[in-house]
Regions:
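Anionic-ligand binding region
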Residues: 122-125
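Class I S-adenosyl-L-methionine
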Residues: 1-14, 18-115, 120
Length: 125
């Protein structure tokens, strides 16, 4: 059964969880944005499909409805799709909208948060 994972890359170097790293190492497709460190993509298998959907305030390579469509399409096509998001998928990341779109399409999905800034800031202070 195919599945899409919304993986938060965390707030910086070393903030990706072990579960997130494991999913990247075993994914067949990664859909990623511009707010993450490119080095994370080196964890993906060489034959992994890579789809860039970069978004920053005022600049979008793909709008949110297009990203949702891409995620549904990938969820149908690939056994393991990782939607890799900078930071936390649910803090300004629109992860909730993406999960709702996947569920509405009948695609199995799971959220895998990275280390969020609320925790990282306190720990690193």
């Amino acid at each position: 059964m195919n599945k899409v994972y919304l993986v938060g890359a965390g707030t910086g170097r070393g903030m990706l969880t072990l579960r997130g790293a494991e999913l990247l190492k075993n994914c067949s497709c990664v859909v990623y944005d511009s707010l993450l460190r490119e080095e994370l993509l080196t964890l993906c298998p060489p034959d992994c499909a890579r789809i860039f959907v970069g978004k920053r305030a005022g600049e979008h390579s793909a709008g949110q409805s297009e990203i949702n469509r891409i995620l549904v399409e990938c969820g149908k096509k690939y056994p393991v799709t990782v939607r890799l998001k900078g930071g936390d998928p649910f803090v300004f990341g629109r992860g909730g909208e993406e999960l709702l779109a996947l569920r509405a399409a009948g695609i199995a999905c799971e959220a895998v948060p990275g280390v969020t800034s609320a925790i990282a800031a306190a720990e690193l202070a």
